[in-house]
Design a protein with these regions (language model features):
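C-terminal binding/interaction regions
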Residues: 1-41, 46-61, 68-150
């Protein structure tokens, strides 16, 4: 594991996204709460948050980070859903692996819960879209832009 003890604490934010292709009928079943395993998107959000919190146990050389925020957002479209994970910490190293793990596990949960009704699902385009680092002092003087909520789709 890399030694980060000489690095100063800073506010770190990472945003990861991915897509899951779903049949239109599957999306209808999800929206009507007709999937046998339960509320698909609520379960996926919780699974993604839990997974982000467990990243250091899943990826051997990742540092254990004190996460101050993990948010999973799911936006549907005609052919599936785009899942976004926002992770935030005040630490000496980045939080991108937590965001990537969160978004991936959220999509795998959707896959698991819908596999009985949709044999053509496909997970794709998992990527890091934002990684920021702000000085810790920015939190106290109002300069920290990472505090805003990320709801709009990012390019």
């Amino acid at each position: 594991m890399v030694d980060v003890s000489d690095k100063p604490l800073s506010v770190r934010v990472a945003i990861a996204k991915g897509k899951i292709k779903l049949q239109r009928k599957t999306l209808e079943l999800i929206s009507e709460d007709q999937i046998a395993k339960g509320d698909v998107f609520a379960t996926a959000r919780i699974a993604g948050i839990q997974a982000a919190k467990q990243t250091a146990q899943l990826i051997p050389l990742c540092h254990t980070l004190p996460l101050s925020k993990v948010e999973i957002d799911i936006v549907t479209s005609a052919d599936g859903a785009e899942v976004t994970c926002v992770a935030r910490t005040v630490a000496q190293t980045g939080v991108e692996m937590e965001a990537l793990v969160g978004v991936t596990i959220a999509m795998l949960t959707i896959y698991d819960m819908c596999k009985a009704v949709d044999k053509d699902m496909r997970i794709s385009d998992v990527r890091l879209v934002v990684k920021t680092k702000s000085p810790l002092a920015a939190v106290h003087d109002g300069r920290n832009q990472s505090r805003r909520r990320y709801k709009a789709p990012l390019q």
